[in-house]
């Protein structure tokens, strides 16, 4: 779990929304994910990215909705995922979006 947390950053992320009903039995991993993403260290990587906790009392399935700056959306249904699986998937999508965003852009080379 520590390795997944070390790779966490919100640089290419536009918004994170975590939705869950606290009275359901399968929300522990989603709450752990919310705690990890809401930490001061992770939040400081992108101060313009809101992390929204949508707590409902309607028996709804726990869900994490991540919107990236390039319009890509990652939706994770937390009912049957562990916190480690969610954090690992989130970190791998962040790396992929970072690589796609900072890829070979014309004019990116400033050396003369």
Swiss-Prot record:
Cellular compartments per GO CC: mitochondrial large ribosomal subunit
Keywords: Mitochondrion, Ribonucleoprotein, Ribosomal protein, Transit peptide
Superkingdom of this protein's organism: Eukaryota
Keyword Ribosomal protein in annotation: yes
Compartment(s) where it occurs, according to its Swiss-Prot or TrEMBL record: Mitochondrion
Keyword Mitochondrion set for record: yes
Principal location class: mitochondrion
InterPro entries per the UniProt record, alphabetical: mtLSU_mL53, Ribosomal_mL53
Subunit-level organization: Component of the mitochondrial ribosome large subunit (39S) which comprises a 16S rRNA and about 50 distinct proteins.
Similarity annotation: Belongs to the mitochondrion-specific ribosomal protein mL53 family.
Listed PANTHER family: 39S RIBOSOMAL PROTEIN L53, MITOCHONDRIAL, LARGE RIBOSOMAL SUBUNIT PROTEIN ML53
Name the UniProt record assigns to this protein: Large ribosomal subunit protein mL53
Organism: Pongo abelii (Sumatran orangutan)
